[in-house]
Amino acid sequence: MKEIIIIEHPFSRYYLTELRNELSDTKHFSETLDRLSYIMAGFAYSSVELKQKKVQTPLDLTSGYAIMKKIILVPILRAGTGLLKGFVDLAPDPVISHIGIYRNEETLEPIKYY
């Protein structure tokens, strides 16, 4: 990853506010997280490389596109798994792996456990 992308989309700002709201119940939180994940995935996938391919339509042969590389999703266990839905739904046959990390509460350093 070359840079941090700050998503300025109005819905992402709204959804983030809803996630931060202590009055959001579990169902609302989960649904809001799913919606935010679609926005994030759209931005993240905007740099996926494509290659041209031919496809036969019912009328004629035409040009189209195929994704060049397999998409591998690696959410960090606990926090990252809640954002998985939008990324999985938008990608064609993604591979899903996991990394487990928690933060040391005293040093604030990440510690891998899986």
Language model segments and positions:
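PRPP-associated nucleotide enzymes
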Residues: 1-114
